[in-house]
Amino acid sequence: MNSSLLIHARLAFLAVLCLCLVCFGACQYEVPITSSPTRKVEERLLGNWTSADGKEKLKVRRLEESTYVLYYDGDLFRAYHSDIEETPFVSVQDLNSNDRKFAYVVWKLSDDGKTLTLRSVNDRVLPKTSKDSASVVALLKQNARNPELFGEEMSFNKEK
């Protein structure tokens, strides 16, 4: 492998790693989007997922009727649907940290159920200072059409 290809591969890996950290590792909000789940676990989301480049693994399991447990990059997260109108949000809580903060993520599953796309909410649009779920919901509704609301996409393919 020549040096430019090696540099490109390392940059691609760093980009994927940063996206993953943004989606799950950046748990920075004090409260979930909604105080309780808005729907039950979706069966098609359960399973093992691998990032498009094959370097990142995400395991999604049912914890309770309406709650998931996620294993990603050695960390555990609890997640549940926090849908707002037509937008499929998920409140993701970091279970490894003492402060147990939340990340806000929107997801999309391909029609064939083989590709899961995640995007985290941009904290420059939705400030970390939001202290209650009602104000979070209001801000998300207010910014629903704001193209800056979400970060870059991160895609995972379902393992067989």
State what each model feature region is:
Residues 28-44, 52-160:
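Calycin-type beta-barrel ligand-binding domains and close structural analogs
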Residues 23-26:
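C-terminal motif of bacterial Sec signal peptides marking the signal peptidase cleavage site
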Residues 2-14:
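Bacterial N-terminal signal peptides that target proteins for export
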